[in-house]
Structure formats: C-alpha cells, structure tokens
Amino acid sequence: MWTLPNLLTLSRIVAVPLLVGFLWWPGWAAGYGIAFALYCLMGITDYFDGYLARSNGAVSRLGIFLDPIADKIMVAAVILILVGTRDIACVHVIAALVILLREIAVSGLREFLAQVQVSVPVSQLAKWKTTLQLVALGGLILAGALPNMPWVHGVGLAALWGAAVLTLVTGWDYLRVGLKHMD
C-alpha cells in the first residue's frame, strides 16, 4: 500500500492546496512562477508514479483508484482558481465548464460501468485530451508569471478550447458505451 508510486500519487493530492495558495493572488508573478514549477513537478510525478508501478510490478488497487482522482482534483482546482482569479474569464469560462462537467460525468459513467462489469480502456484520444488540458492549464499559470508576454495567455486559452473540444469528443465516446448498458 505505501509503495513509492502510491506515495507519489498522494503527494500530488497533498500539493493541490499549495498550488492553489500560490495562485490565489492575481498579479503576483512570483506566486504564479512558483505555482508553475509546482504544477510541472506534479505532472512529472504523475508520469513517474505510473511508470514505476508498471515497471516494478507495484501496480496496486489503491494506485489504480487514487491516480485518476489525483488528476481530477488537480485539474478541477486549477480551473476553479483560474476562473476565480479571472485568468480564465468571459466566454472562456464555457471551455472550462465543459472540461469540469465532462470529468464529473465520465467519473459517474465509469462507476456505473464498473457496477455492470464493463471496462472502458482509456483511448489514445483521451490521453491527448488530458495532455492538452495539462498544457493549457500550465500555459495559463505560466502566463501569470510572465505578465509582459500576453501571447502566452492567448496560447493557453487556445489550448483550453482545444482541450474542451477533445473533452466533448471523448466524453461522447464514454457516453455511447454507457448508453448500451442502460435499461
């Protein structure tokens, strides 16, 4: 249970309040810089927890359970704080909302499908969706650290919209599978 991969996953969950704390004050470029470094570190641990678990035969039920939760907590927290600080504002909130709602819906669908003993493997497109989400949010955090480079914010918002589109497509894939198994 207390394997290195599981500890790395837990460290991501524990780091979320720190990440949010550094993003709390809009306009504090140093805070955004620290948050960006922490966000990158969290992304690296996300990669290594899975890699270490698979390569060392340390895959556990706890890790399988916690890893997607850690990812969703991090994404949801960053989206919410960036909306709260208006780093994601106006029409761009729609893209953020699409991402949040899809994550909630797919979590519910996965729970339902597990109860009817249907496994839905993560598709390659869903992996690209996650990557684009993480790049978008990282870009938006980085934009706060680089206030003299407004194009970084624009790139982050464009990536957020790209992630929202992939979110809808992959969400529809999960919904189609779920609908086949509903009464």
Predicted regions and their residues:
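Alpha-helical transmembrane bundles and membrane-interface segments of multipass inner-membrane proteins
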Residues: 1-183
